[in-house]
Each structure stands twice: as structure tokens, then as C-alpha cells.
Amino acid sequence: AVARLAMALAPHARTVWIACGPGNNGGDGLEAAALLQQWGRRCVVTWLGSSERAPADARASWHRAQEAGVVFADTAPQGLGPQDLCIDALLGIGLASGKPRNADTSLLTLLQALHDAPAPVLAVDIPSGLQADTGTYAPELIADSAYGTGAGSLFHAQNTLTLLTLKPGLFTASGRDAAGTVWFDDLGADLSNEAASAWLAGAPA
């Protein structure tokens, strides 16, 4: 899903830079990199994970990316232009639990690079640092002087592909600006039998 939308959004891209976190959101980025490389794009991945600690699905995607010839680098590639594309696959909904996440230097550096990139950004599931339930930025990112002192300094994606379900945070608070154009893919999942998460009070019988 990510790779298909990337091709549609940036059909003339020569280079796609994908910033990947250590979890499953990063795994989605790695999978997209493998496919885009196979489809003739030059893909450069900066991965904060490792094959030893990655979830099984992310590890499998890492193997496919390597086999496809994806370049792994510590920083964003030089020469990105407005026709190219950046993909934010760093955090996803990893902040939804409300548990504190240490904003380490590597993460902050990549967030800043996405913020400064001349190419547009496609976020996977939700822009990194945005909380999926509230649409507010993670306090530890806002407060960190290495990245910025206010939500306005955090990067905004031009497009966001949200997967499986629509996240409330994409449409509330800072999310409306941070997410850009929101695209949705349910990945073929049938959620019709899922228990309702809320009920409408006073609904007609």
C-alpha cells in the first residue's frame, strides 16, 4: 500500500528516502523500500533498528530490502529535489499507548532531516511524534531543544497513508495540519465483526 501510493504521488521521483524506526512502522517502510527498488526507484533507507532486535515481520522486510538492492545509510541522501519523495516510517502509532518514549538523538536528527528535506513527505499511518488519539505532539519531542520548542517547528507531512483504521488524531488538534492529505487503506481487513468501541447515546431503535 505504501509503495503504490508513493509511486502515484511521485511518479517522476529518482530517489526515495525512507526513514525507518525500529518497530513495525519501520517494517512497513522497509517493505515499501524493497518494492520501490524493484520498480526501478533508487531507495535509500535510514533504519534505527537492527536485524537482531526487530519484530519478525520487520526483519523479513529488511531481508527483502537487502535482496532488492536498497541502499542503507546513516543520513538522508544528498541531492533530494522536489520531484523526489521522503517517507516517514519512524514511529507510527507507537505513541498511542501514552507510555513515555525516549526521544534519542538519532530519532531527533531524522525528524529534523524530514522537516528540512526539499522533497515532500509521505507519513506511514500517522506523522511521527503525533499522538494517534489526541492529535497533539508528544511532549518529549516538543520540549527537546535539539528539535524545537513548539509544535510549529515539528515537520508536517504533505500526505499521510493511514492503515487499517482512521486515527482520531489525524483530524483533531495539530493533526489536521500535520497530516496533510489523508489517505486510507484497510489492507483488506474485515472489521465488520469487531466489537464497537463506542455507542451513540439516544440512537433510534
Predicted segments, located by residue:
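YjeF_N-associated NAD(P)HX repair module
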Residues: 83-205
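Nucleotide and nucleotide-moiety/phosphate-recognizing core
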Residues: 3-92, 96-124
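Small-residue (G/A/S/T)-rich helix-start motifs and N-terminal tracts that mark the onset
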Residues: 1-49, 54-55, 59, 149, ...
